[in-house]
Design a protein with these regions (language model features):
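Short alpha-helical segment of the dimerization/phosphotransfer core of two-component systems
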Residues: 30-35
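Conserved catalytic submotifs in the C-terminal HATPase_c
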Residues: 56-61, 78, 83-94, 131
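Short conserved segment of the HATPase_c
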Residues: 6, 152-166
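Glycine-rich ATP-binding loops of the HATPase_c
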Residues: 193-199
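Helix-loop junction within the histidine kinase core
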Residues: 46-57
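Short alpha-helical Gxxx[C/S/T] motif in the catalytic ATP-binding
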Residues: 176, 181, 185
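Disordered, acidic interdomain junction associated with two-component signaling
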Residues: 79, 87, 139-142, 155, ...
Length: 369
C-alpha cells in the first residue's frame, strides 16, 4: 500500500511527463497485484490445508519475473534506507515453465520479511543461481535471501513454517503480518518439488535458501553471437563482475573487470593510448570510491572518440538519468543483468541497432561451457 501511495504521489508531481507517469502506473499495477495476493493469504492457506491448491504450468521469462520482484522491493528498501543487492550466478536458462504467480509470491514474501526485520542502513541481498541438474529437461535454481537484521530466536526458528506463527518479541511487536506467509511459502515450495531452509543468528541476521527444479521451456533458441568486441565491466561487487564477464564470454566478447572506478579509468585510458581501446564500458552506478556517473564523466573528458558507456543500477535509473546523461552515459541497465538484458543493451547502445531482434534475443539459450 505504501508503494501504491508513493507512486501515486510521484505520478501527480510529474503529470506533464508521460514517461514518468507511465512508469509509476506500471509500478502501481504491480504493487496492487501483490497487495491482492496478500489479502488472499487466508484463502490460500485454506486451499492448502484442504488439498485443493494446484499450480499452473506456464512459460515464463525469468528476467521479467525478477524485474517485477525487484520493482516491488525497491519501494520498501528505499523507504527503510537499506542497501538492496541482487546478483546472478551461472544462469543458463531464462525461459522456464512454472507458476509465475506462486514463484513471485514465495520470493516476495521472503524478501519482504528480510526488509521488514532489517533496521535502516542494513543490507538485504538476493542471489539467484542456476545449479547443476541431472535432468536435462529441468534446471535447478537456488534463491538465497540474506539480511543483516535482528535475527530469529532458536525457539521460534523451529516453528517458523507453521501457520499463524509470530515471534513474541518487543523488537517486532509493531511489525504487521498475518503469520501465514512463511507457512504458505513452505507449502508452495513443497508443491513445486523444492526445499526451503533457514538459518539465523540473533543480532546478526537471517538467511533463507530456496531450491526449485524448474522445467526448461522448449521454445528456447540457440546461441546469439556478437562481432569481436572488447568491453570493461566496473562494479565494486566481485560476484557481479565475474557474472557479467562470463555472460560476455559466452557471446564471444572479450572483457576485463575492475572493482574501483579510479583504476577503471586508468585501464580505459591505457588501452586507448596503446591503440587497443575498449568498445564499451559497463559501469555500476553506486561505487564507494568513485561512483559510475563520476567515472563516466572523467572518461568522457579524457577520450574524445565515441565510446559507449552503459550504467547499471540496482534501482530505478530515472533517479540519476539526467545527471548521467550530462556526464556522457549512453544507456542504462537495471540489476540483475540477465543474458537477454545484456544483449539488448549491447545491440542498442554498442552496435547502434534498433531492437529489431528483440524477439530473437528474448529467446536466448546459452549452452553450458
Amino acid at each position: 500500500m505504501n508503494a501504491i501511495m508513493g507512486m501515486t504521489d510521484i505520478a501527480s508531481a510529474h503529470i506533464d511527463t508521460p514517461e514518468k507517469v507511465q512508469d509509476c502506473l506500471r509500478k502501481i499495477s504491480l504493487s496492487s497485484q501483490h497487495l491482492l495476493g496478500l489479502i488472499n493469504d487466508v484463502l490460500d492457506m485454506s486451499k492448502i490445508e484442504s488439498g485443493k491448491m494446484t499450480l499452473a504450468e506456464e512459460v515464463i521469462e525469468l528476467p521479467e519475473v525478477m524485474d517485477t520482484i525487484v520493482s516491488i522491493m525497491q519501494s520498501s528498501v528505499k523507504a527503510r534506507q537499506q542497501q538492496f543487492d541482487v546478483r546472478l550466478r551461472h544462469i543458463r536458462h531464462e525461459q522456464l515453465c512454472c507458476d509465475s504467480l506462486r514463484l513471485r509470491q514465495v520470493l516476495i514474501n521472503v524478501l519482504s520479511n528480510a526488509s521488514k526485520f532489517t533496521p535502516p542502513g542494513g543490507t538485504v541481498s538476493f542471489d539467484i543461481e542456476e545449479t547443476a541438474s541431472e535432468n536435462a529437461a529441468k534446471a535447478w535454481f537456488k534463491f538465497t535471501v540474506r539480511d543483516t537484521g535482528i535475527g530469529i530466536k532458536p525457539e521460534f526458528l523451529r516453528d517458523i513454517f507453521k501457520p499463524f506463527t509470530r515471534e513474541k518479541d518487543s523488537r517486532i511487536d509493531k511489525t504487521e503480518g498475518s503469520g501465514l506467509g512463511m507457512a504458505i511459502s513452505k507449502k508452495i515450495v513443497d508443491l513445486m518439488g523444492g526445499t526451503i531452509e533457514v538459518s539465523s543468528e540473533v543480532g546478526t541476521g537471517t538467511e533463507f535458501t530456496i531450491r526449485l527444479p524448474l522445467p526448461i521451456s522448449e521454445l528456447e533458441l540457440g546461441n546469439f553471437k556478437f562481432p569481436d568486441l572488447k568491453i570493461i565491466v566496473v562494479d565494486d561487487d566481485v560476484i557481479v563482475c565475474e557474472h557479467t564477464t562470463e555472460l560476455l564470454r559466452q557471446i564471444g566478447i572479450r572483457s576485463d573487470w575492475e572493482t574501483c572506478g579510479q583504476r577503471a579509468v586508468q585501464k580505459v585510458l591505457a588501452a586507448h593510448q596503446a591503440g587497443e581501446p575498449y568498445d564499451a564500458v559497463i559501469l555500476d552506478c553506486r561505487m564507494p570510491d568513485q561512483d559510475g556517473v563520476e567515472t563516466a564523466a572523467i572518461i568522457r573528458r579524457a577520450i574524445s572518440e565515441p565510446l559507449p558507456i552503459i550504467l547499471i543500477s540496482a534501482y530505478d535509473s530515472a533517479d540519476v538519468e539526467t545527471k548521467a546523461r550530462h556526464a556522457g552515459v549512453n544507456g542504462f541497465m537495471t540489476k540483475p543483468v540477465f543474458m537477454s538484458t545484456l544483449c539488448r543493451a549491447l545491440q542498442r547502445y554498442v552496435l547502434g541497432q534498433a531492437a529489431a531482434d528483440e524477439q530473437k534475443l528474448s529467446l536466448i539459450h546459452i549452452s553450458a561451457p
